């Protein structure tokens, strides 16, 4: 009897009613869009296939000689890694095969990709493998994605078609995103997603081949004494920014009697993931080398800002402007960024006189 009881206790400690990403997507569709066509849900499922494919490829990269440079540069002049090229191909093929994507923007492609024969109603912007320069050292990297719905015919006439796919479908205000997510490939593969109704985190179970809900309804702490910034660029910063970071390191009353702790990995996905879980401030300001900042709006700043805001935080640029209010003119336009716990971002806004 003792053996039976032990087995029963062991079984009861295992949750067998798990929520997979596919189940979560369908549940959300039934709750919030009962008349939905299912196209958006199918697109999200195509995205998770791409994430699983990239995750598996990264895990095997060193064994199949995918570590190192590919000998070319991407759209913004960064040296491409072999995995950058492969990750880009995986993403393009997955989005094309989905049949739900009309327009694709990739960091690795100089121009907009339009799937002319696709009936898709969505535009996807992505950085297939963000932080790839860290891969050789085994540091966590990730995929960042933002989703827009393409422009519908403006006159509402049944005889007129929706957009055939132009830059206008993505060169728009960040508030018009319908979803954003990132996947972090590290010790585990984590997917963090928002469709505009909060933030939820999933972990890939390699045995099941499914993303499992492990961080439901993520919320950022109001404030946390942690800052994340590349202080190797201090000599290039504007005095206002250098002064602000210096003040964070003081054990002043304003900092509750102790200095902020520095936590910087150098991979945006990993740094933002930590910030979402623990709180604090992540920043990549403009400097003398990159006055407008270095992060691309469409597939870095926009999706991360959307996620952080949906988790109760804030995201602004060096001038204190809300990231999601900005409108890019080109698909690879850049921005500075300060994001994280609302109290910590407010501290920066007060410092520059915007609060």
Swiss-Prot record:
Which example biological process does GO assign this protein?
A: sucrose biosynthetic process
The note on cofactor binding and number reads: Binds 3 Mg(2+) ions per subunit.
Q: Does the keyword DNA damage apply?
A: no
Which amino acid positions bind AMP, per UniProt?
A: 25-30, 37-41, 121-122, 149
Q: Does the keyword Transport apply?
A: no
**EC number(s) stated in the UniProt entry for this protein:** 3.1.3.11
The residues that the entry says bind substrate are 130-133, 230-233, 263-268, 284, 294-296
Q: Quick one: which residues bind Mg(2+) 2?
A: 107, 127, 129
Catalysed conversion reaction: beta-D-fructose 1,6-bisphosphate + H2O = beta-D-fructose 6-phosphate + phosphate
**Any single GO CC term annotated in Swiss-Prot or TrEMBL for this entry:** cytosol
Family of the protein in this entry = Belongs to the FBPase class 1 family.
Q: State what protein this is by name.
A: Fructose-1,6-bisphosphatase
| Provenance organism | Kluyveromyces lactis (strain ATCC 8585 / CBS 2359 / DSM 70799 / NBRC 1267 / NRRL Y-1140 / WM37)
> By which gene is this protein encoded?
FBP1
């Amino acid at each position: 009897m003792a053996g039976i009881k032990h087995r029963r206790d062991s079984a009861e400690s295992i949750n067998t009613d798990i929520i997979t990403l596919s189940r979560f997507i369908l549940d959300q569709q039934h709750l919030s869009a009962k008349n939905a066509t299912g196209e958006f849900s199918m697109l999200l499922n195509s995205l998770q296939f791409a994430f699983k494919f990239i995750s598996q490829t990264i895990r095997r990269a060193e064994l199949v000689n995918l570590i190192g440079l590919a000998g070319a540069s991407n759209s913004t002049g960064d040296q491409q890694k072999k995995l950058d090229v492969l990750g880009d191909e995986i993403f393009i093929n997955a989005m094309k095969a989905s049949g739900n994507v009309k327009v694709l923007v990739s960091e690795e492609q100089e121009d907009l990709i339009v799937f002319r024969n696709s009936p898709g109603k969505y535009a996807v912007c992505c950085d297939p493998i963000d932080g790839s320069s860290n891969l050789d050292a085994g540091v966590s990297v990730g995929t960042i994605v933002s989703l827009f719905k393409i422009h519908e015919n403006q006159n509402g006439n049944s005889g007129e078609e929706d957009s055939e796919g132009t830059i206008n479908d993505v060169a728009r205000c960040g508030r018009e995103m319908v979803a954003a997510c990132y996947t972090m490939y590290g010790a585990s593969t984590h997917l963090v997603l928002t469709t505009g109704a909060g933030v939820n985190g999933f972990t890939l179970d390699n045995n099941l081949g499914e993303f499992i809900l492990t961080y439901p309804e993520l919320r950022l702490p109001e404030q946390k004494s942690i800052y994340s910034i590349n202080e190797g660029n201090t000599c290039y910063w504007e005095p206002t920014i250098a002064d602000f970071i210096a003040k964070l390191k003081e054990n002043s009353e304003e900092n509750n009697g102790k200095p902020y702790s520095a936590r910087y990995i150098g991979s945006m996905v990993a740094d933002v993931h930590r910030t979402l879980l623990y709180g604090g401030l992540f920043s990549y300001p403009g400097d003398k080398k990159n006055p407008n900042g270095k992060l691309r709006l469409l597939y870095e700043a926009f999706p991360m800002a959307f996620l952080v805001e949906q988790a109760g935080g804030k995201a602004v640029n060096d001038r204190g402007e809300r990231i999601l209010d900005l409108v890019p003119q080109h698909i690879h336009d850049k921005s500075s960024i300060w994001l994280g716990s609302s109290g910590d971002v407010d501290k920066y806004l007060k410092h520059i006189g915007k609060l």
